[in-house]
Amino acid sequence: GVQTCALPISFNPLKWGDAFTEGNSWHYTWSVFHDPQGLIDLMGGKDGFNQMMDSVFILPPIFDESYYRAVIHEIREMQIMNMGNYAHGNQPIQHMLYMYNYSGQPWKAQHWIREVMDKLYTPAPDGYCGDEDNGQTSAWYVFSAMGFYPVCPGTDEYVLGTPYFKEMKLHLENGKTVTISAPNNGDDKRYISLMTLNGKEYTKNYLTHQDLMNGATISFKMDVKPNQQRGTKEGDFPYSFSNEFKKKK
C-alpha cells in the first residue's frame, strides 16, 4: 500500500498558545526551576545561555497569535511593557530574571529586577502589570523587594536579586528577626557592590532558609555600576540537580 508521512511543521518560538499556555517558547524555555545548570549545558555553556537570556529583552515585543485567533490580554500587556519578549504580566517567565545567578552574571539579574520593580509596579491606574493568579505576581514583588526569591521551592534556597528599600525587617514566628539593610540604596543604585551576612562578607548568590530562620542581619552596599566579580564563581551559584548528579558519578 501507499505510505504517507506528515511533513514537519516549522517551529515558531513567537507563537503563543498551543503547547505554551498563554505564552510562547521564549517564556517557557526557562521552566527548569530544579536544574538551570542542565539547561545551561544544553545551550552549550554559560556564554550561550546568557546570550539566550539577553535575547529575550533584545527581541522586540512581536508575536504570533494565530492559535488564539485574537490578541489576548497577556500579549497586549507584553507589548505595553515594552521589555522585548519578556512578559511579566503572566507568571511562566517571572523567575527567569533570577537565572543570571546560575550563569555567572548576577548583575544582570539586579538590573532587570529593578527595571520591573520601577516600571511595572506603580501607584497609578495602569500601574499593575497583569493578572494576579493566586497571588503570584504580588508575591514576586514582596520577595523581590526584600532582595531574594524562591526560584525552586523544592530547595531550601532563596536566590538573590536586589533590595528595593533602605531597610526592611521580617519578624518571624519563632521570635527571630531578619533585618535587610541597604542604607545607600536609591533610584540610581541598583547593583550590589558588597554583601555581608551577620557581619561577614558573603559572595553566594542565594540565602538558605536556615539563614533566615536563625535570624539574620543582611547588609548591602549598593552602587551605580555593577560589580562583575561578585558571585561569579561556580561555588556561589544556587542549587541545580545536574550538579548534584555530577557529584555522585
PLM features per residue range, with description:
Residues G1-L7:
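Short, small-residue-biased leader/transition segments that mark boundaries at the very start
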Residues P8-D18, G23-W30, W107-Q110, Q136:
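Gly/Pro-rich turn-and-neighbor structural signature
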Residues F11-N12, G17, T21, N50-F57, ...:
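A post-motif C-terminal structural segment
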Residues F11-W16, V32, I72-E77, G89-I93, ...:
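Short acidic (Asp/Glu) and glycine-rich catalytic loops that position anionic groups and cofactors
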Residues S25-M43:
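A conserved active-site cap/scaffold subdomain adjacent to cofactor or substrate pockets
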Residues L42, F57-S66, Y86-H88, I93-K249:
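Non-catalytic C-terminal accessory modules of carbohydrate-active enzymes
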